[in-house]
Each structure stands twice: as C-alpha cells, then as structure tokens.
C-alpha cells in the first residue's frame, strides 16, 4: 500500500486501459499486452542486488527475474487477474503464474509466464539466463484475491506443440543437411580445381585439351546445381 507504488500502478494501468479500449482487446489480449510491456524491460542482474521496488524497475527500465515478476504480478492483480509468484529456490529463479483454463504448469492451477524475455503466455523458460533449466517444483506465492483467469491456454499450448515439433524436425534433418553441405563442398572443390587446370591450358595455348575439358566442367556444374536445388 505504498502510495508511490500505487501511483505508479494507476499511471501504467491507465495507459494500458486506453490501449485496450482503442484496440478493442479481449481480457486475454489485455493480459498479453501488459505482459509484453514487462518482458520488454531490459534484463539486468547484479551480484548481491536486493529486490527493487516496482517503481525502481520502471524508472530504471530494467530488472532481474524477481523485479520483473513482482512488477507484472502487481499490474495484473490490480487488473483483477488471479496471479501468483512462482519461486524456484533451487535454480534461484522467479516467474509468474496466472490462473488459466488450460496449459497449466506442472501440478499447479497456473499457466507459466516468463518475464525475463519475450515469450508466449504458458511457455516455460528453456535455458535460464545464467544457464541450466528449471527442474524443481516452484513455491507458489499467491498475490491478492483477484478472480479473472486466462482463457487462451489451449491456443498457446498449440503454439508450443507446433514449435516443439518444428524443433524436432530440424534436429532430425540436421545430419542430412550436414551430409549435403559436405557433398556440395566436395563438388565445388572439384569444379574449382578443374577451372584452375583449364586456365593453365588456355594460358599455355593448349586449346585442344582445354576444349576437351569443357564438357567435363559443364557436367560437374550441372550436377552441382542439381544437388543444390534439391
């Protein structure tokens, strides 16, 4: 109930509401708008740096996972979204949870929001800023008594599944791509060597042997282009 913090929240939510009304945003889109704002603040962490007040995070335009998650929690709870801080003690990481209808994080009633970078609501952090990944179960710290939930969990789950599938396909194709790259490099080297030989023949006036190599050169180039277009 610090007046300085409340003034900040009123100022920010006032601007967000103007955007919501002018763009005709749904409640889910409004949550995503506020989330994107907090994610856009520069990530910065300092050794032995105590948690900032939300007003400090906004004025500095930066903060670590604790600072940004607490700022987002304050904003969303004041806009009637049911939220909780997700504190990962083992990994020294904090994120935000928002009550949702789908795509819930582990065994919680919240979907995950990563505040340290741009990501969709519901998609957990991959590799943490300091390295490693989230393995432990979070300590859940509810904020406020709001009731509104996020209802686009199924959509973000579909986005996440599509992304994971594309990553898997890329991984499966990687050996084939490397093999093709090696084959093309070998063919390019043969063409380069032949062109060097042909230049030598031309320079020495050996036109007959030069002409004999033209069809060979053209065949190598044709094969290279065919492989390249596959």
Regions found by a protein language model. Give the residues of each.
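A structural boundary/capping signal
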Residues: 1-230
